[in-house]
Swiss-Prot record:
UniProt keyword DNA-binding present: no
Homology family: Belongs to the dGTPase family. Type 2 subfamily.
UniProt cross-references to NCBIfam families, sorted A to Z: dGTP_triPase, PRK01286.1-1, PRK01286.1-5
Origin species: Rickettsia prowazekii (strain Madrid E)
Bilayer-spanning residue ranges: none
InterPro entries: dGTPase, dGTPase-like, dNTPase_2, HD/PDEase_dom, HD_domain, PHydrolase_assoc_dom
Domain of life: Bacteria
Stretches assigned to the HD domain: 62-198
Pfam families: HD, HD_assoc
Protein's name according to its UniProt entry: Deoxyguanosinetriphosphate triphosphohydrolase-like protein
Biological process annotations from GO: dGTP catabolic process
Keywords from the named record: Hydrolase
An annotated Gene Ontology molecular function: dGTPase activity
């Protein structure tokens, strides 16, 4: 049974374009299915999480990451008597706007777009779901419920500073109340993202031999996990050891999140969803100690993994590809597919840049590499 402060699909604020409900799915389940059927969702399979797609079959990509986030979000929401369907749906959609090559690709595209209001993957997710996906004759986008769109655009909390241009434009026709916190389900999806990525980036980095178990000594509590597991299982293999470490880490993070969130709900005497939105802090949270530990893991990952020599070398290549494609399309829009070229407003520089950014952002890693080799390589075999 849903709590009084949960997002009830029967009380959804609805869709921008009115539709007749279906009797066999609630509104949030319907949104989940629409997201899964988008081209953007399928493309996540070939987009980088940390390691470039072709570097190994077992490394995570944006699709597997999104699925893992959705399972954590669903479990947490269920335990808190929230709408697990809404939490799962927001989790599945949260990375749709990512560029090829992960954060390296986003930084490169943002640099290309600095004269045109920049680029943000969270805002791009909204744009994909409300404009760029073309699946329905009556409207652009996939016409999701207000609650799902709110959760996507407020993935990092209320928007209090500068507002992305597309978000501001869309908000005029469908007010997402940008200055308030999102639903508890959206907050769950956001922290499920943190739980999943820090845990699994550790796992993948060990597998890729960028870090080893000795380096985990920098994280005392993680090192304690390793010590305890080795003491309990004398002949444990390195691959099994990291799986057990990650399993224990995820369990403790979820347990802590549930405890602190219940404490917050009781302390604030929350009775409805509006009280959650208008609160001065996120109702869904970890304890202070666990937040500190999460920040330590993030710093460790930046230092040891994301800023490692191997990852910097990959980042340089990815930056060259994204910026190279942007420049060549800006120089000659005829190199764009016809269905993208016609979106440019009278060859205006700003309109041209935005369309090109949308096109590049939608590319998979392998398509971006292929396109770069074809357009930018001096090798005539690529033509």
């Amino acid at each position: 049974m849903l709590a009084s402060y949960a997002s009830d699909p029967l009380k959804s604020r609805g869709r921008l374009y009115k539709e007749i409900p279906t009797y066999y799915r609630n509104e949030f389940e319907r949104d989940r299915d629409r997201i899964i059927h988008t081209n953007a969702f399928r493309r996540l399979q070939y987009k980088t999480q940390v390691f470039i797609n072709h570097e190994g079959d077992h490394y995570r990509n944006r699709l597997t990451h999104s699925l893992e986030v959705s399972t954590v979000a669903r479990s947490v929401a269920n335990t808190l008597n929230l709408s697990s369907d809404l939490a799962e749906t927001i989790a599945l959609a949260h990375d749709l706007g990512h560029t090829p090559f992960g954060h390296a690709g986003e930084r490169a595209l943002n640099e290309c777009m600095k004269e045109y209001h920049g680029f943000s993957h969270n805002s791009q997710s909204l744009k994909i779901l409300t404009l760029l996906e073309k699946r329905y004759a009556a409207y652009n986008g996939v016409n999701l419920t207000w609650e799902v769109l709110e959760g996507i655009v407020k993935h990092n909390g209320p928007i209090l500073g500068a507002i992305n241009e597309y978000v501001a434009e869309y908000n005029k026709q469908n007010d997402l109340e940008l200055s308030t916190y999102a639903s508890a389900e959206a907050q769950v999806a956001s922290l499920a993202d943190d739980i999943s990525y820090i845990s699994h980036d550790l796992e993948d980095s060990i597998g890729a031999k960028i870090i080893d178990f000795d380096s985990l000594a920098e994280l005392q509590y993680i090192d304690n996990y390793v010590f305890e597991l080795k003491a309990k299982f004398k002949d444990i293999s390195p691959s099994c050891l990291i799986y057990e470490v990650v399993r224990k880490l995820i369990h403790e993070l979820i347990t802590d999140l549930l405890w602190q969130t219940k404490e917050n709900l009781n302390k604030e005497k929350i009775t409805n969803i509006d009280e959650i939105r208008n609160l001065h802090y996120p109702i869904v949270d970890f304890t202070e100690k666990t937040n500190e530990r999460i920040n330590e893991i993030k710093k460790f990952l930046h230092k040891r993994v994301y800023e490692s020599n191997k990852m910097i070398a990959i980042s340089i290549k990815c930056t060259k590809i994204v910026q190279g494609l942007f420049k060549i399309y800006m120089d000659d829009i005829n190199l764009l597919p016809t269905n993208w070229k016609i979106l440019i407003d009278s060859n205006k520089t700003y309109s041209k840049a935005r369309v090109i950014a949308d096109y590049i952002a939608g590319m998979t890693d392998r398509f971006a590499i292929q396109e770069y080799n074809q357009l930018c390589s001096p090798n005539f075999n690529n033509i």
